[in-house]
UniProtKB/Swiss-Prot annotation:
InterPro entries: Aminoacid_DH-like_N_sf (IPR046346), NAD(P)-bd_dom_sf (IPR036291), THF_DH/CycHdrlase (IPR000672), THF_DH/CycHdrlase_cat_dom (IPR020630), THF_DH/CycHdrlase_CS (IPR020867), THF_DH/CycHdrlase_NAD-bd_dom (IPR020631). This is Bifunctional protein FolD. Homodimer. Catalyzes the oxidation of 5,10-methylenetetrahydrofolate to 5,10-methenyltetrahydrofolate and then the hydrolysis of 5,10-methenyltetrahydrofolate to 10-formyltetrahydrofolate. Pathway: One-carbon metabolism; tetrahydrofolate interconversion. GO terms for biological process: L-histidine biosynthetic process; methionine biosynthetic process; purine nucleotide biosynthetic process; tetrahydrofolate interconversion. NADP(+) binds at G164, R165, S166, S189. The gene is folD. SUPFAM superfamilies: Aminoacid dehydrogenase-like, N-terminal domain, NAD(P)-binding Rossmann-fold domains. One of its GO terms (cellular component) is cytosol. It catalyses: (6R)-5,10-methylene-5,6,7,8-tetrahydrofolate + NADP(+) = (6R)-5,10-methenyltetrahydrofolate + NADPH; (6R)-5,10-methenyltetrahydrofolate + H2O = (6R)-10-formyltetrahydrofolate + H(+). The keyword Thylakoid does not apply. Gene3D superfamilies: Leucine Dehydrogenase, chain A, domain 1, NAD(P)-binding Rossmann-like Domain. It comes from Listeria monocytogenes serotype 4a (strain HCC23).
Length: 284
C-alpha cells in the first residue's frame, strides 16, 4: 500500500517558513509585494485569484489585485503590466491565464519584467532553467520537486518518466528532474507502449488532463507517483489523471487529488515572490 504524500501539510510548512522570513524583512521596513492581474469574469480564475490573494496576505506580503474587463485592449493590458514593472512596491507580477482570445498571452508574458516574473514563464527564466542557472521556476513544477524530496528519496540516479509535455508543467518538471541528475523520459499521447515506458519509472509524474488515465499496469512497484491532474470522473467527483484506487496498492508514495500537488502551487508562488523581492533589494 502506497504512502500518501500530504501536499497540504508540506505547503503549510513551506508557507510558515516564508511567513517567518517576511516578518523579519518587515521589521527592516521591507515588504514583498505581489500584483495579480485578472482579465474578464472567468469564475474558476476568480476563485483561484481570491485564494492567491488570501494566502499572500496571510504570509504578510502586500497583495494587489487589478481587475480588467473581458473586452480590454491588448495595448491597455500591456501598459498596466509596464506600470507594475516600474512600481517599486511590487516584486512579483502574475497575469492570470487564460486570457481572452484577442490578447496574445505570449506578448503579455514577454512584457512582464523577468525579475518580477514569479510564474516563471518569461523566455529568460525558461532559458535559465534549461541551462541550469538560478531562475524563477514555474510554481507547479517547483512544488512537484518539493513533494518528491519530502519522501526522503534521493532523486539523483533515479529513472523518471513525465507523461505530458506542456510548457507549464511537463517540460519544466522534466528539466528540473534532469537538473537533479535523474535520467528523464518525456512521454506523451504519441508515445508507443506508454504503460511499458511508464513502468520503468522510479518517479512518475502524470500531467495529461485525462481523468484516471494511469492505471496499475503503468506503475513499477514502489514508485513515487505524482498526479498533477484536476479532473472530474463519471460521477462528477474531483479526481486526478491517475486512477488512485487502482494505483495506490502498487505505488511506494502517491499524491492524492485533491490535497497533493494543488496546495503546493500557491505556496511556491509565495516563495518565488519572496525570492524576487530579495533579489531586487540586493540589486539596488
Amino acid at each position: 500500500m502506497g504512502e500518501i504524500i500530504d501536499g497540504k501539510k508540506l505547503a503549510k510548512e513551506i508557507q510558515e517558513k516564508v511567513t517567518r522570513e517576511v516578518a523579519e524583512l518587515v521589521k527592516e521596513g521591507k515588504k514583498p509585494g505581489l500584483a495579480v492581474v485578472l482579465v474578464g469574469d472567468n469564475q474558476a480564475s476568480r476563485t483561484y485569484v481570491r485564494n492567491k490573494q488570501k494566502r499572500t496576505e496571510e504570509a504578510g506580503m502586500k497583495s494587489v489585485l487589478i481587475e480588467l474587463p473581458e473586452n480590454v485592449t491588448e495595448e491597455k493590458l500591456l501598459s498596466v503590466v509596464e506600470e507594475l514593472n516600474e512600481d517599486k512596491t511590487i516584486h512579483g507580477i502574475l497575469v492570470q491565464l487564460p486570457l481572452p482570445e484577442h490578447i496574445s498571452e505570449e506578448k503579455v508574458i514577454d512584457t512582464i519584467s523577468y525579475d518580477k516574473d514569479v510564474d516563471g514563464f518569461h523566455p529568460v527564466n525558461v532559458g535559465n532553467l534549461f541551462i541550469g542557472k538560478d531562475s524563477f521556476v514555474p510554481c507547479t513544477p517547483a512544488g512537484i520537486i518539493e513533494l518528491i524530496k519530502s519522501t526522503g528519496t534521493q532523486i539523483e540516479g533515479k529513472r523518471a518518466v513525465v507523461i505530458g509535455r506542456s510548457n507549464i508543467v511537463g517540460k519544466p518538471v522534466a528539466q528540473l528532474l534532469l537538473n537533479e541528475n535523474a535520467t528523464v523520459t518525456i512521454a506523451h499521447s504519441r508515445t508507443k507502449d506508454l504503460p511499458q515506458v511508464a513502468k520503468e519509472a522510479d518517479i512518475l509524474v502524470v500531467a495529461t488532463g485525462l481523468a484516471k488515465f494511469v492505471k496499475k499496469d503503468y506503475i513499477k512497484p514502489g514508485a513515487i507517483v505524482i498526479d498533477v491532474g484536476m479532473d472530474r470522473d463519471e460521477n462528477n467527483k474531483l479526481c486526478g489523471d491517475v486512477d488512485f484506487d487502482d494505483v495506490v496498492e502498487e505505488a511506494g508514495f502517491i499524491t492524492p487529488v485533491p490535497g497533493g500537488v494543488g496546495p503546493m502551487t500557491i505556496t511556491m508562488l509565495l516563495a518565488n515572490t519572496l525570492k524576487a523581492a530579495k533579489r531586487i533589494w540586493k540589486m539596488n
